[in-house]
Amino acid sequence: MQAIILAAGEGVRLRPYTQLIPKPLMTINGIPLLTFHIDKLNSLGITNEKIIVVVSHLKEEIVGFLNRFHRGVRVVMQGEKKGTAAAVSYAKNLIDDNEIVIVYGDTIFEDNLKDFIREENAIGAYEVEDVSRFGKIVVENGYLKEIKEKTETGRGFIFAGLVKTKKEFLEELDKVKQNEKSGEYYLTDAIMSFNQKHPFKIYALKGRWFDIGKEESLIEARRVFNFPDNFFK
């Protein structure tokens, strides 16, 4: 099993913090987000040599950090094409194993993912009070039916930036069309395309989850996470 961590975002909404520090190296109670994800994957039996990190913004800082603290992790530079689908596509040539895990590097969560990685084809979901910031996942009989745009409001499940799937999924990336509004290529479009042939099971994350995209989320995550010694076990 291999893993891809998406760590190429500029962190625009976290400026001025991210002007000098890349978002994946922002710390939660002293632990960089990137370390959190690598340690979590290691605890699942995915070694550093099986982990690929996609970088762009302040890439030299991330590469230096990995060389110092997480030797063996491979790094891929995201090119001109932007967005999460594009990021994964730049890493796909390094995928040899049939099973893959894709992780959005600007999230943090309590679930140990041991049940998640046992699934053949699943996406992580998290229930929130207001889905309007994220876009809503429509669930039918435990499986993904639809991922709606950010026009929905109210309580519901959102995509938590976690995918467990097979290598075949990577073939969908070249089919993703550029979003007219943002100019980016979204992984959720590839998920919905693959879902037509291989339905994704919805895995509801246990415990707390944060998208570290705004200052208030960063502050709240730092308040609630204290990382006990057995956190990654």
Predicted features, each with a name:
Residues 2-5, 13, 27, 31-104, ...:
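Conserved N-terminal catalytic core of the sugar/cofactor nucleotidyltransferase
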Residues 25, 137-139, 202:
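A structural signal for short hydrophobic beta-strand segments in well-ordered beta-sheet cores
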Residues 107-110, 209:
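A short, conserved beta-strand element in the Rossmann-like catalytic core
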Residues 111-134:
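Conserved donor-nucleotide/metal-binding helix-loop-beta segment in metal-dependent transferases, i.e.
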Residues 143-211, 215-233:
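Catalytic-core segments of class I nucleotidyltransferases/pyrophosphorylases
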Residues 1-19, 199:
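N-terminal nucleotide-binding beta1-loop-alpha1 segment
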Residues 38-39, 59, 89, 110-119, ...:
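Short alpha-helix within the catalytic core of nucleotide-sugar-dependent glycosyltransferases
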Residues 10, 106-107:
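Active-site metal-binding loops of divalent metal-dependent hydrolases
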